[in-house]
Amino acid sequence: MTVEQLSPHSKSHPLTGEEIRTAFLHFFAERGHQVLPSASLVPDDPTVLLTIAGMLPFKPVFLGHEERPSSRVVTSQKCIRTNDIENVGRTARHQTYFEMLGNFSFGDYFKKEAIQWAWELSTKTFGLDPKYLVVSIFREDDDAYEIWRNIIGVNPDRIIRMDEADNFWSSGPTGPCGPCSELYYDFNPELGNHCIDLEDDTRFIEFYNLVFMEFNRDSTGRLSSLSNCNIDTGMGLERMAQILQKVPNNYETDLIYPLLEKVAYLVGVDYQKTDKKTRISYKVIGDHIRACVQLISDGVSASNLGRGYILRRLLRRIVRHGRLLGIPKPFLIDLGEVAISLMKSTYPQLLERRDVILKELQREELRFLETLERGERLLADLLSNNPKEISGEQAFELYDTYGFPLELTQEIAEENSIEVDLKAFEKAMQRQRIRAKAASTTIDLTLQDTLDKAVRELKPTNFKGYECLTETSTVQAIFINGELAQEAQENDVIQVALDITPFYGESGGQIGDTGILFKESVTNCLIEIDSVIRNNDVFVHRGIVKNGRLQVGDIIQSQVHHINRRRAQINHTATHLLQASLKEIVGSEISQAGSLVSFERLRFDFHCSSPVSSEELEKVEKKINLWISESHSLVVKEMKIDDAKQAGAVAMFGEKYGTLVRVVDVPGVSMELCGGTHVANTADIGAFKIVGESGIAAGIRRIEAVAGPGVFDYFNARDSVVRILSERFKVQSNEIVDRVIALQDEVKLLGKSLIKAQEEIAFAKTSALVSKATAIKSSHYIIHRLDGVPSEALQSAAKVLVDQLGDCSAVLLAGTPTQSDPNKVILVAAFGAKTVAHGLHAGKFLGPIAKMCGGGGGGRPNFAQAGGRDAKPLDKALDLAREQLMGALL
């Protein structure tokens, strides 16, 4: 596929970001690559918080831990990196959220094909002139040099040899590794080939990286050749869009620029007329909102831990920069809508999760606005004394007592050209940690490596959970906060490894068992287990010591919570039936993409190109309940993996299988490779109910369902809602829908009537104000307080007054719009054309006035609006406005 095929008017209309993505995927699909959807931003890899690279979902394949999905794969992977967050908006190319286009070979083609296709894609499909391209290679990679020089024909002066730090990839100190080759775009080839410096990002931009995994490095550092060589590549979508669309930075591509325009609209300015420093805030907002929308879509909620903290930090930076620009009101919902609209065609799940995304944006924004206003007032008090620095104790008090993020304290300090004493801040944090007894519910990821190494020294756990729910066990190891410990005491949150366990460890989509560990009796020593994971065949039990003391070597009783186990068995068998029913009703090409089997419900993700219709869902559900009623007995047996696959057993990519596998067979219905726990007979499930179907990525659907007791819980909850609504509306249950529709229509009519009445009141009050205008020379001004008038009506009133008073006029209206929030303040300023020509700027005039009311705002020279959170100083603020306006007009 060429540029011309993608866009008939490509010579006058550059490729859009979406067309670039499509062209890349199509190019490699034509060359035998399987197109896979983007993985979630929340990775399976416990060593990283977020998906930071296109290859991350395939890391287990590259390391030889998992089977390859295909020998050739191509993806467009959404990624987030926050290590350079301070550079976002300040450079042309740094972003937190980006898409990485990548083609991968798992033991198939290698260096020659990868280089040839990279060149063909760049020069033919995307139409880049070869004279604008520069290539880098690892200094010792003569094979790559020969291919670039003699097969591709690149000028040797434009093939740059680089050191290991720049052009050699490795997965760690040991393991698979190999040289890289990168393609750069040269914005100024007329400068010639002498003294090419690829670190000069004003001239060069790297847009395509090819990694040739051909070696294995052992513990001594010695390199040996791999039997199967792999290819891992990455092309930044935003960077390629910058090049093809001929814009000065990634932010002004069609992937991001509409967000900058939306921010400019909210501020009331033309983005192209803003200065370089101001544009930093626009770019930060445009970048971060894309990251936030995608994170929330992938199930992340703002919090103070892990990836939740990353989301919270990004959201708070958006709000902070919005306030710097003078946006006077909450704006994340408006911005979120634009971000969803920009990305919805590639990620349809954004539309399906729109309400969840917008609700989380609004919730976190309102929460932070309160924190921000309080913290900024405190910081303003500190800065009013012109300190040389903000002490660590002051920064810590803002953080600990008022919830004001350290990063924002640093940013505000930097804006005022002073520093924060970070060493003293860290000391205060350390004292706080000592004072607060650790009872953390999470393990620091930086300690995960310690736990992994310790677990590798332990013997594999003997799992007895298929046969029994109680067992006598010996404590092999105890971990507290990821570190090895010899004993644990009351209230310690611990992880325990046992020699024998009846507890199922999370795998295959099924969550781990819950239960208790105790010595001779529960009064002697009791540990409540809330989850169990498998780490290299060692089952690690996580829980809290409720009483007594536990030591390594203790002999204890392990007891699984039988009700939760039973629910997991029901939901797991129901999941197998769901996959079988989907294959029968929707299509045999259905394949599993993921699953979750919990105690309360089940979730099944599967590859499917279109939504499953309501009729199909009804048939799927009916079929499953038929199989349940037919009382099929399950047959569980161990088989050689080749025999199992030959017998038709379904396997899933992502699961690790040995030569012997466990097969769960519902004769005539379903046969799967599965290590999970199941019921003995389908009749034990009782009932099955689908509660939701949605898309979570391009080509991947998700069904959520309940089974067994969960069905009764679901219907009881529904009945409770129906009963409450019937009582509330005083109608029968079958009349609720009609009543709701009627009420919706009534609310719409009342809303329109209310808005009309408010506008009439505002205009009535406005008419009386014209005669009260104050005259100064040839100008007239009105500064007046109007309470109980909504923002929109206040804006209309100000504009009407200026029209009536003429070009030599100035109007400032302010008030508290609602009785329900008496501290909320709205301010509006409108200036006539000659007043603006006189040198007055409505936005700049209104800002300091709003600040007196604990707020801020801004706008255009002729019109501005602002908000505040403190109505008490409003009258004094208006008096100040009168003084300043009179002085300016005299």
Curated annotation (Swiss-Prot):
List, separated by semicolons, the cofactors it needs: Zn(2+)
UniProt-listed Gene3D superfamilies: 2.40.30.130, 3.10.310.40, 3.30.54.20, Bira Bifunctional Protein, Domain 2, Threonyl-trna Synthetase, Chain A, domain 2
GO MF term list: alanine-tRNA ligase activity; aminoacyl-tRNA deacylase activity; ATP binding; tRNA binding; zinc ion binding
Under Enzyme Commission nomenclature, its number is 6.1.1.7
| CDD domains linked | AlaRS_core (cd00673)
- Asked if the keyword ATP-binding belongs to this entry, the reply reads yes
Q: Does the keyword Protein biosynthesis apply?
A: yes
Mind naming one GO cellular-component term on file for this protein? cytosol
Q: Where does Zn(2+) bind?
A: H572, H576, C674, H678
Instruction: Spell out the SMART domains in the cross-references.
Output: tRNA_SAD
Question: Cofactor comment in the record?
Answer: Binds 1 zinc ion per subunit.
Record's subcellular location: Cytoplasm
Q: Which InterPro entries match?
A: aa-tRNA-synth_II/BPL/LPL (IPR045864), Ala-tRNA-lgiase_IIc (IPR002318), Ala-tRNA-ligase_IIc_anticod-bd (IPR018162), Ala-tRNA-synth_IIc_core (IPR018165), Ala-tRNA-synth_IIc_N (IPR018164), Ala-tRNA_ligase (IPR050058), Ala_tRNA_ligase_euk/bac (IPR023033), DHHA1_dom (IPR003156)
| SUPFAM superfamilies named among the record's database cross-references | Class II aaRS and biotin synthetases, Putative anticodon-binding domain of alanyl-tRNA synthetase (AlaRS), ThrRS/AlaRS common domain, Translation proteins
Extract the Pfam families matched here: DHHA1, tRNA-synt_2c, tRNA_SAD
Superkingdom of origin organism:
Bacteria
Which catalytic reaction applies to this protein? tRNA(Ala) + L-alanine + ATP = L-alanyl-tRNA(Ala) + AMP + diphosphate
Task: Tell me the GO BP annotations in alphabetical order.
Answer: alanyl-tRNA aminoacylation
UniProt keyword terms in alphabetical order:
Aminoacyl-tRNA synthetase, ATP-binding, Cytoplasm, Ligase, Metal-binding, Nucleotide-binding, Protein biosynthesis, RNA-binding, tRNA-binding, Zinc
What this chain does, per the entry, is described as: Catalyzes the attachment of alanine to tRNA(Ala) in a two-step reaction: alanine is first activated by ATP to form Ala-AMP and then transferred to the acceptor end of tRNA(Ala). Also edits incorrectly charged Ser-tRNA(Ala) and Gly-tRNA(Ala) via its editing domain.
The free-text domain note is: Consists of three domains; the N-terminal catalytic domain, the editing domain and the C-terminal C-Ala domain. The editing domain removes incorrectly charged amino acids, while the C-Ala domain, along with tRNA(Ala), serves as a bridge to cooperatively bring together the editing and aminoacylation centers thus stimulating deacylation of misacylated tRNAs.
Q: Which family does it belong to?
A: Belongs to the class-II aminoacyl-tRNA synthetase family.
Report what the protein is called.
Answer: Alanine--tRNA ligase
Q: Which organism is it from?
A: Prochlorococcus marinus (strain MIT 9211)
Encoding gene, per UniProt annotation: alaS
